[in-house]
Amino acid sequence: MRTLQRVLLLAGAAWLVAACGGNGGGDEAAPAPAPPSPSPCDTPGTTYARFTKAAVLSAGVGGGAAIAGCTGAIASPQWTQTGGPAVELLSAKSQTLHFEALTGGRYSFRADFRDTTGAARSEDFVIDFAPLGLGTRLALRANHSVRMGGNVSVRAWPTLAGGDSVATITWAQLEGPAVTLDTRDPNVALFVAPQVARDTPIRLRATLTTAAGHSASDEVLVLVERHAQAAANDSGALWAGDHVSRVHAYRPNGPHAAVLAACVYDSAQRDNNLCRLSQLPFLAQEVGTGVPTVEQVMNRVVVSHDWAGRNFEAFLNTHDVQGDFRRMLKSVAAIVIGTHVRPSFYYAGTGAIYLDADNFWLTPEERDTVNEAPDFRSSFGQTLQYTTLWRYVQGTQSIFRFYDPRQRVTRGNVALLEEAGWLMFHELGHALDFLPPSVYGTLQDANTAWGSIAPRANGGQLASHTVPSLYPLTSSVMSGLGQVRFFGAAASATQNAYSPQQVAAFFAADLATDDYAYATPFEDVAMTLEEFLMARRLNYRRDFAVAARPGPGATGSTITVAWGQRGRIGEPALRPRLRAIVQQLAPWIDPAEVDQLAAPIAMRAGDSWTGNLSLPAPLPGPRLHKTEPTLEDLWQLERAERRRHRLQPWSKPLPRQATGTPAAAVR
């Protein structure tokens, strides 16, 4: 271990930018980019470096600072405010600090961490803010850290004088390895963090020009962490080809805190060093035959940001009245919630579920930390003539509400149920499929999570094996289309020629509740259980429809439904397979509830997706609305198509430890 450690404060003009109106404090033009400064890491013997967004800022924009590793990784970062008006630190366990200063003054912070040698270190930061001005300003949110190869999003937030409007927002990179900025939406800059030799800052500037001729700018600090991910061709790596982001145990003093992240979300995991259940047991082993307490569940939660764990705990305390979610969670070893987890998935290799934090934010500040980069798989199936739509409704209203990304929106606690309830039922349906209650008593501490699952999975004993065998989906056409829509297979000329009406006929005659069931048998079972539980436990009914592929500018009010149903899960032909799924995966529920499901309601072919919210009676007035689309109309249609991109199945090798051969995993 080295005895001499050196740290330098980067004091060059490239990082210590004076206010002078250039950081959101007024209407002055943006200052010219400063010449690059030498990195403090270039000094021999330096193991870490510190960066600040600027020495002086104006209130109303975000302050930022970072600790970077020069010769290796920084571990266990923790930011604490030590002076100034109180601010919320939502990324306190990240290498990069972001905070919102609403008033002028001096703000001070301490960063505690372990440097690249493992030595405990502490650094103090002081950032001054001038008083909040009344002029035009621009704030970039948020300063943050990302591992190389990760998606990055930064959003620009203009504040304008009354009657003024945005003319342009332009972006420029000021420092760091060159990246390609996607600014097709000028309010957001997207890029992929580049490969770096050491932790490296990237600095962007956005400049606002208004219709009245005013201007303002702000800068943002993004620290790219040097963290090697597992190579895609590394057959022994558990996360080969995947991006694994930084996470930590939500409860640092919990009984499993020391091993949680290492056992379920670490790029270094390999199939020959999986954690044994003696290190991290399934929740069922800890609970026995009872229902887990919220505290027992929270001891298994791993997060990128503590707010995600806090809101997940509120979700359980408020919305798990009947204990279904906690009972289902007995089949997992951990719950990972991350701002870079997209899409959500379950992984039998670790026995954990992985949830997109976008489902759990409540405040605009929490939302600022959630990555906005879309999943590349959203382009699948673009040559087909049809699309499928879905939503959950209560009465005649969709439970999915529009939260304008350009507004500082706060969501109520009920949003946690609306946004995350269906997701939890779906991913936990997968967990129960691979580890049903009937096998809890066979779990052995000496085994691994995958070692406990593999014999049944490879032996064809899962519900996703037995139920489709007894009650199969029979449409080969829909199965083929499922490969196009959910795995990116190229569509054939025949597939591209199918009309929405033809696809609707293929689907309606079969036993699936959603065309996502044709992705894999695992999704078939999870979709069926999800819709049943949403209907019987939460009183939300599911709409599913087939429609023509929407063109540019289409909305829920203009797209025409070719065929659809509300509550397809109540279709009599589906009940035998549903009953078998419930009996195997949710035995605490009386299977007689399957027969108590309401009969499905047919949608009105030829009416719009929005018009079909009112069933069975149509709303008065014209059925198809040709008015100028609103943002909400556009969003509701996007949401109706988007679910598949949040739950995209993705085959990847499972650990070979138990059987010696890989098996396909549904994520």
Task: Place the predicted regions along the sequence by residue.
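Pan-zinc metallopeptidase signature
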Residues: 487-667
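Surface-exposed, flexible coil segments in extracellular/virion-facing regions
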Residues: 80-98, 173-192
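Exposed beta-strand face motif in extracellular beta-rich ectodomains
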Residues: 105-109, 200-204
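Acidic, Ser/Thr
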Residues: 62-74, 155-163
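C-terminal edge beta-strand
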Residues: 119-129, 214-228
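Bacterial Sec-dependent N-terminal signal peptides
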Residues: 17-51, 124-126
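Acidic/His-rich structured neighborhood in mature extracellular/periplasmic domains
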Residues: 309-484
